């Protein structure tokens, strides 16, 4: 039988997603993907700078894990401020608005053979 392991730990999760992403993709897929690539680079850099680790992405969303709630909140605030500055310096077609949430709590991680660790908060 396949071996699996379950662990619990307190962790901090930062989640981001683009407001109106589906509509933006419908209206101008090429421009939306270009804008997302720029914004994704911003959030990835900030997550790294604040000692976080991206553990999942899907479309317009990013999930990152932090050991420190303070670092996660600072990262989220800097990301929102950087996106606001970017939006003020580009045309309307290049602007993106993000929702950002931070959650701290007991997480369950599952490891099954060679499959990646899956967190459930």
Residue ranges of predicted features:
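Active-site phosphate-binding and catalytic loops of NTP-dependent enzymes
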Residues: 84-92
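Single conserved hydrophobic/aromatic residue that forms the stacking wall/gate
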Residues: 112-121
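Hydrophobic pocket-lining residues within nucleotide cofactor-binding pockets
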Residues: 18, 107, 115
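Short amphipathic alpha-helical interaction patches enriched in hydrophobic/aromatic residues
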Residues: 22-25, 87, 108
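Catalytic NTP-binding/metal-coordinating core of nucleotidyl cyclase/transferase enzymes
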Residues: 2-78, 82
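A short glycine-enriched loop-to-beta-strand structural element that forms part of the catalytic core
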Residues: 94-109
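Cross-kingdom TIR/SEFIR domain
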Residues: 80, 92-95, 113
């Amino acid at each position: 039988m396949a071996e699996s392991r379950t662990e619990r730990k307190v962790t901090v999760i930062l989640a981001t997603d683009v407001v109106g992403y589906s509509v933006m993709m419908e209206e101008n897929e090429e421009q939306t993907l270009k804008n997302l690539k720029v914004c994704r680079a911003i959030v990835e850099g900030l997550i790294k700078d604040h000692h976080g680790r991206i553990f999942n992405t899907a479309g317009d969303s990013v999930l990152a894990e932090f050991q420190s709630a303070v670092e996660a909140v600072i990262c989220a605030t800097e990301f929102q401020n950087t996106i606001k500055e970017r939006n003020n310096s580009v045309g309307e077609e290049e602007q993106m608005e993000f929702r950002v949430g931070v959650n701290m709590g007991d997480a369950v991680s599952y490891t099954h053979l060679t499959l990646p660790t899956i967190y459930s908060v």
